[in-house]
Amino acid sequence: MEFPRKRRGRDSQPLQSEFMTDTTVESLPQNPFASLLSTRTGVSAPSGIREAHSQMEKRRRDKMNHLIQKLSSMIPPHIPTAHKLDKLSVLRRAVQYLRSLRGMTELYLGENSKPSFIQDKELSHLILKAAEGFLFVVGCERGRIFYVSKSVSKTLRYDQASLIGQNLFDFLHPKDVAKVKEQLSCDGSPREKPIDTKTSQVYSHPYTGRPRMHSGSRRSFFFRMKSCTVPVKEEQPCSSCSKKKDHRKFHTVHCTGYLRSWPLNVVGMEKESGGGKDSGPLTCLVAMGRLHPYIVPQKSGKINVRPAEFITRFAMNGKFVYVDQRATAILGYLPQELLGTSCYEYFHQDDHSSLTDKHKAVLQSKEKILTDSYKFRVKDGAFVTLKSEWFSFTNPWTKELEYIVSVNTLVLGRSETRLSLLHCGGSSQSSEDSFRQSCINVPGVSTGTVLGAGSIGTDIANEVLSLQRLHSSSPEDASPSEEVRDDCSVNGGNAYGPASTREPFAVSPSETEVLEAARQHQSTEPAHPHGPLPGDSAQLGFDVLCDSDSIDMAAFMNYLEAEGGLGDPGDFSDIQWAL
């Protein structure tokens, strides 16, 4: 009888694997690494091992789900959702919440905000003393006053016991109730409550930890609170009392604080929100109230505005050399219309005497000279009242007076000045008539110009220069060039160039005698009196200028002839040369 031939590797393998499996099962309790060896050698694990591994994975998943569920209950729901969040969403919101808490300072974290050596009562006393107000806590739901400090008696004259437990809206002005309700209604946490889709119940997460502040919960607003002397009752919105009486009945309070949330068991006010099981934490306004000072407006119809101003400059003889563009809106003249004209042509005749005194004072002093109110003629012939501040400008290099700066301020307009002239009486009316009679109308000259007014400034400049020569050194010490420089500076310019660049010329002995005679003639001239000066004296001053220029030119020509060999050089040893 023949048996079938057995192939190698087919029948022997099951026997070998069965043998190894029995051995592995027997050695499992003793050798924990047998399962790895059996897996590597291709031996399948028994059902007991697979069951133990499944139980271990289940416990791990249950623990992770419990931790995620606990984490989701600790995160405040920013947006209430109808479905349950998955694990990834819970972890993402947890990360966002931790990032938002990272920027919070220790000032808002409760007990860590105060030093360890200060007690709570001492800290509250220092805060109230430094704030100069009163601390109060108001519920955001109904406006009930939970707490108010004793300092309210000093600020609003209320007793602490009379305010605690009352409604804040009963003490406010009727027009401020809506504004305060708006400030209390904007809470940092949402009003909606999330609902579970499976159980159809509202999530009731226990309140754990101290209340924290959130961004956007700060409040700062004003409201009017009734005074203690007025009985607490509702007033009609449309009251006929004046603002002054309203100020006596109400005090303006500046409120600054934060919205905070507390559990009902901590506050002890379960009835404030209805006392339901699903009611959330109580939101309150913790604020500091300061009395805002009330300023009673003055009973005046005038509006304080900056007066209209413009700046002008005029030379020593009173002729304009610069006019500000703002003068056009006040006077009506363009700047180029005033340049080169004398300021006395526009002054009222009654003001000439006072303005000439100020003109002399500003030429002899370096201080600012304030003029009285005077009348200035505008382009249409009317007058405006101005007040000016004059001061002279001296060139720091040449030490010579270049011009006078005038800062002009408008006091009265055209209509006011006309009324003031009418109220002055007959004397002013007669002076006005004489002023109109003295005015001339010449082509090329501004209308209403006073006869001889253009030479008043030139006469004043000549008079001041003569006084300065008398008060200075003796006439023998002065050189002829100084005489010419002083006379030419009266008109605000020079005939042959700037005074600082002119050199003294050599003159002959005969010409020196002529200069001495001219100087003695000028020194013996009498001073001109105040007021409108005649035209002869002004013409005399200009004649002297012309004579001095002629003598100067003659000396210059004599010097050129001597240099070119055309004439006798003469003797120059007796001439005093200015260095």
From Swiss-Prot:
SUPFAM superfamilies in the cross-refs: HLH, helix-loop-helix DNA-binding domain (SSF47459), PYP-like sensor domain (PAS domain) (SSF55785)
Compositionally biased residues, Basic and acidic residues: 50-59, 186-196
Induction: Constitutively expressed in the SCN. Little change throughout day under dark/light cycle.
A GO molecular-function descriptor: DNA-binding transcription factor activity
Span of domain PAS: 119-190, 296-366
Region (Disordered): 40-61, 186-213, 469-536
Domain of life of the organism encoding this protein: Eukaryota
Tissue expression remark: Expressed in the suprachiasmatic nucleus (SCN).
GO biological process, one term: positive regulation of circadian rhythm
Cross-link (Glycyl lysine isopeptide (Lys-Gly) (interchain with G-Cter in SUMO2)): 233
Localisation per UniProt entry: Nucleus
Span of the annotated motif Nuclear export signal 1: 118-128
GO cellular component: CLOCK-BMAL transcription complex; cytoplasm; nucleolus; nucleoplasm; nucleus
Annotated motif Nuclear export signal 2, positions: 331-339
Keywords: Activator, Biological rhythms, DNA-binding, Isopeptide bond, Nucleus, Repeat, Transcription, Transcription regulation, Ubl conjugation
Cross-linked sites for Glycyl lysine isopeptide (Lys-Gly) (interchain with G-Cter in SUMO2 and SUMO3): 226
Keyword Nucleotide-binding: no
SMART domains for the chain: HLH, PAS
Subunit structure: Component of the circadian core oscillator, which includes the CRY proteins, CLOCK, or NPAS2, BMAL1 or BMAL2, CSNK1D and/or CSNK1E, TIMELESS and the PER proteins. Interacts directly with CLOCK to form the BMAL2-CLOCK transactivator. Can form heterodimers or homodimers which interact directly with CLOCK to form the transcription activator. Interacts with NPAS2 and HIF1A. Interacts with PER2.
Role, per record: Transcriptional activator which forms a core component of the circadian clock. The circadian clock, an internal time-keeping system, regulates various physiological processes through the generation of approximately 24 hour circadian rhythms in gene expression, which are translated into rhythms in metabolism and behavior. It is derived from the Latin roots 'circa' (about) and 'diem' (day) and acts as an important regulator of a wide array of physiological functions including metabolism, sleep, body temperature, blood pressure, endocrine, immune, cardiovascular, and renal function.
Protein name: Basic helix-loop-helix ARNT-like protein 2
Species of origin: Mus musculus (Mouse)
Gene: Bmal2
